[in-house]
Amino acid sequence: LHSFPTRRSSDLTDQTTNEGDWQLGDAGSTLNVNNVSRSNAHNPNVATLMDQDAGVVPDGFDPNHVTGENGGNAYPYGQCTWWVYQRRTEMGLPVGSYFGNGNMWADSARNLGYWVDNTPRHVGDMVVFQGGQFNADTTYGHVAIIEKINADGSIEISESNAKGLGVISSRTFSAADASQLQFVHY
Protein backbone atom coordinates (compact mmCIF):
# COMPACT_ATOMS: atom_id res chain seq x y z
CA LEU A 1 0.00 0.00 0.00
CA HIS A 2 1.12 3.48 -0.83
CA SER A 3 0.56 6.46 1.35
CA PHE A 4 -0.12 9.77 -0.38
CA PRO A 5 0.07 13.10 1.40
CA THR A 6 -3.21 14.81 2.14
CA ARG A 7 -3.69 18.15 0.40
CA ARG A 8 -4.91 21.08 2.42
CA SER A 9 -7.02 23.81 0.83
CA SER A 10 -4.15 26.24 1.38
CA ASP A 11 -2.01 24.05 -0.94
CA LEU A 12 -4.43 24.73 -3.79
CA THR A 13 -3.73 28.46 -3.86
CA ASP A 14 -0.34 27.89 -5.51
CA GLN A 15 -1.71 27.08 -8.95
CA THR A 16 0.03 27.22 -12.29
CA THR A 17 -0.46 30.41 -14.30
CA ASN A 18 -0.25 30.99 -18.02
CA GLU A 19 2.44 33.63 -17.77
CA GLY A 20 6.22 33.43 -18.03
CA ASP A 21 8.26 30.30 -18.61
CA TRP A 22 7.79 26.77 -17.37
CA GLN A 23 10.79 24.66 -16.45
CA LEU A 24 10.68 21.27 -18.10
CA GLY A 25 12.66 18.08 -17.36
CA ASP A 26 16.07 19.72 -17.10
CA ALA A 27 17.32 23.19 -16.29
CA GLY A 28 18.10 23.95 -19.95
CA SER A 29 14.53 23.33 -21.14
CA THR A 30 11.93 26.05 -20.97
CA LEU A 31 8.54 26.52 -22.53
CA ASN A 32 7.46 30.07 -23.24
CA VAL A 33 3.69 30.00 -22.76
CA ASN A 34 3.30 32.97 -25.10
CA ASN A 35 4.15 30.53 -27.90
CA VAL A 36 1.45 28.04 -26.91
CA SER A 37 -2.00 28.21 -28.47
CA ARG A 38 -4.98 28.79 -26.23
CA SER A 39 -7.27 27.25 -28.86
CA ASN A 40 -8.52 23.67 -28.82
CA ALA A 41 -8.19 23.38 -32.62
CA HIS A 42 -6.51 20.20 -33.84
CA ASN A 43 -5.11 22.00 -36.92
CA PRO A 44 -2.16 24.11 -35.68
CA ASN A 45 -2.72 26.76 -38.37
CA VAL A 46 -6.36 27.14 -37.32
CA ALA A 47 -5.24 27.32 -33.67
CA THR A 48 -2.91 30.21 -34.50
CA LEU A 49 -5.66 32.07 -36.37
CA MET A 50 -8.11 31.51 -33.52
CA ASP A 51 -5.60 32.97 -31.07
CA GLN A 52 -5.38 36.06 -33.29
CA ASP A 53 -9.19 36.23 -33.41
CA ALA A 54 -9.70 35.91 -29.65
CA GLY A 55 -12.80 37.85 -28.68
CA VAL A 56 -14.43 37.84 -32.13
CA VAL A 57 -14.81 34.12 -32.86
CA PRO A 58 -18.55 33.36 -32.91
CA ASP A 59 -19.97 31.87 -29.71
CA GLY A 60 -20.13 28.10 -29.90
CA PHE A 61 -17.74 27.86 -32.86
CA ASP A 62 -16.12 24.42 -33.08
CA PRO A 63 -12.71 24.62 -34.79
CA ASN A 64 -12.74 20.85 -35.21
CA HIS A 65 -15.88 20.80 -37.39
CA VAL A 66 -16.13 18.48 -40.38
CA THR A 67 -14.03 20.04 -43.16
CA GLY A 68 -15.58 18.40 -46.20
CA GLU A 69 -12.17 17.06 -47.27
CA ASN A 70 -12.86 13.79 -49.04
CA GLY A 71 -9.97 12.36 -51.00
CA GLY A 72 -8.30 15.42 -52.42
CA ASN A 73 -9.01 18.04 -55.05
CA ALA A 74 -12.16 16.96 -56.90
CA TYR A 75 -12.50 20.23 -58.84
CA PRO A 76 -11.79 20.44 -62.59
CA TYR A 77 -8.23 21.55 -63.39
CA GLY A 78 -7.83 25.29 -63.87
CA GLN A 79 -11.19 26.36 -62.48
CA CYS A 80 -11.35 28.89 -59.64
CA THR A 81 -12.50 26.13 -57.29
CA TRP A 82 -9.49 23.98 -58.22
CA TRP A 83 -7.10 26.84 -57.40
CA VAL A 84 -8.68 27.67 -54.05
CA TYR A 85 -8.51 24.02 -53.00
CA GLN A 86 -4.84 23.87 -54.08
CA ARG A 87 -3.89 27.12 -52.35
CA ARG A 88 -5.69 26.39 -49.06
CA THR A 89 -4.04 22.98 -48.96
CA GLU A 90 -0.62 24.61 -49.52
CA MET A 91 -1.38 26.93 -46.59
CA GLY A 92 -2.36 24.05 -44.32
CA LEU A 93 -5.93 25.31 -43.94
CA PRO A 94 -9.11 23.23 -44.17
CA VAL A 95 -11.07 23.12 -47.42
CA GLY A 96 -13.77 20.84 -48.76
CA SER A 97 -13.50 18.61 -51.79
CA TYR A 98 -17.10 19.14 -52.94
CA PHE A 99 -18.23 22.69 -52.12
CA GLY A 100 -19.84 23.11 -55.56
CA ASN A 101 -19.58 26.14 -57.83
CA GLY A 102 -17.83 29.27 -56.59
CA ASN A 103 -21.08 30.99 -55.60
CA MET A 104 -21.99 28.00 -53.40
CA TRP A 105 -18.83 27.93 -51.27
CA ALA A 106 -20.01 30.21 -48.44
CA ASP A 107 -23.19 28.18 -47.87
CA SER A 108 -21.44 24.82 -48.29
CA ALA A 109 -18.74 25.83 -45.80
CA ARG A 110 -21.22 27.36 -43.33
CA ASN A 111 -23.28 24.14 -43.40
CA LEU A 112 -20.18 22.19 -42.32
CA GLY A 113 -19.41 24.59 -39.47
CA TYR A 114 -16.85 26.96 -41.02
CA TRP A 115 -16.86 30.58 -39.83
CA VAL A 116 -18.26 32.70 -42.69
CA ASP A 117 -18.89 36.46 -42.67
CA ASN A 118 -18.26 39.66 -44.65
CA THR A 119 -14.96 40.61 -43.00
CA PRO A 120 -11.58 39.75 -44.51
CA ARG A 121 -9.53 38.57 -41.53
CA HIS A 122 -6.53 36.55 -42.68
CA VAL A 123 -4.28 35.62 -45.55
CA GLY A 124 -5.77 32.34 -46.73
CA ASP A 125 -9.41 33.28 -46.24
CA MET A 126 -11.58 32.07 -49.12
CA VAL A 127 -13.36 34.89 -50.97
CA VAL A 128 -16.81 34.05 -52.38
CA PHE A 129 -18.33 36.02 -55.27
CA GLN A 130 -21.98 35.67 -56.16
CA GLY A 131 -23.02 35.43 -59.81
CA GLY A 132 -22.12 38.67 -61.62
CA GLN A 133 -20.45 40.21 -58.58
CA PHE A 134 -17.25 42.03 -59.63
CA ASN A 135 -17.37 40.35 -63.06
CA ALA A 136 -17.85 36.83 -61.69
CA ASP A 137 -19.62 34.37 -63.97
CA THR A 138 -23.34 35.13 -63.76
CA THR A 139 -24.26 31.45 -63.32
CA TYR A 140 -21.39 29.92 -61.34
CA GLY A 141 -20.02 32.83 -59.35
CA HIS A 142 -16.35 32.75 -58.37
CA VAL A 143 -14.04 31.94 -55.48
CA ALA A 144 -10.52 33.17 -54.69
CA ILE A 145 -7.95 33.37 -51.87
CA ILE A 146 -6.76 36.38 -49.86
CA GLU A 147 -3.01 36.76 -50.30
CA LYS A 148 -2.62 40.09 -48.48
CA ILE A 149 -4.68 42.45 -46.34
CA ASN A 150 -3.41 46.01 -46.58
CA ALA A 151 -3.39 48.60 -43.80
CA ASP A 152 -6.25 50.50 -45.48
CA GLY A 153 -8.45 47.37 -45.42
CA SER A 154 -8.06 46.61 -49.11
CA ILE A 155 -7.33 43.00 -50.03
CA GLU A 156 -5.18 41.34 -52.66
CA ILE A 157 -6.43 38.01 -53.96
CA SER A 158 -5.12 35.20 -56.11
CA GLU A 159 -7.52 33.42 -58.42
CA SER A 160 -7.70 31.04 -61.35
CA ASN A 161 -9.76 31.20 -64.53
CA ALA A 162 -10.47 34.95 -64.38
CA LYS A 163 -8.00 35.46 -67.26
CA GLY A 164 -8.25 32.00 -68.80
CA LEU A 165 -8.44 28.38 -67.74
CA GLY A 166 -5.58 27.58 -65.38
CA VAL A 167 -4.18 31.12 -65.45
CA ILE A 168 -3.39 32.25 -61.90
CA SER A 169 -3.85 36.00 -61.58
CA SER A 170 -4.38 38.60 -58.89
CA ARG A 171 -6.62 41.56 -58.18
CA THR A 172 -6.95 44.16 -55.45
CA PHE A 173 -10.28 45.19 -53.92
CA SER A 174 -10.84 48.30 -51.84
CA ALA A 175 -12.10 47.87 -48.28
CA ALA A 176 -15.53 49.09 -49.40
CA ASP A 177 -15.69 46.55 -52.23
CA ALA A 178 -14.34 43.75 -50.03
CA SER A 179 -17.14 44.34 -47.50
CA GLN A 180 -19.63 43.24 -50.18
CA LEU A 181 -18.03 39.79 -50.47
CA GLN A 182 -18.27 36.72 -48.24
CA PHE A 183 -15.21 35.24 -46.55
CA VAL A 184 -14.76 31.67 -45.36
CA HIS A 185 -12.20 31.67 -42.56
CA TYR A 186 -11.69 28.25 -40.96
Where are these regions (language model features)?
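Short, small-residue-biased leader/transition segments that mark boundaries at the very start
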Residues: 2-9
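Aromatic- and glycine-rich peptidoglycan recognition patches
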Residues: 147-186
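Secreted/periplasmic proteins that engage bacterial cell-wall peptidoglycan
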Residues: 41-143, 148, 159
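Short, exposed beta-strand "edge-strand" segments with a Pro/Gly-rich flavor and a Y/T-containing core
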Residues: 4, 93-102, 167-173
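Intrinsically disordered, low-complexity, compositionally biased regions/tails
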Residues: 24, 29-32, 59, 117, ...
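Extracytoplasmic intrinsically disordered, low-complexity "stalk/linker" and propeptide segments
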Residues: 11-48
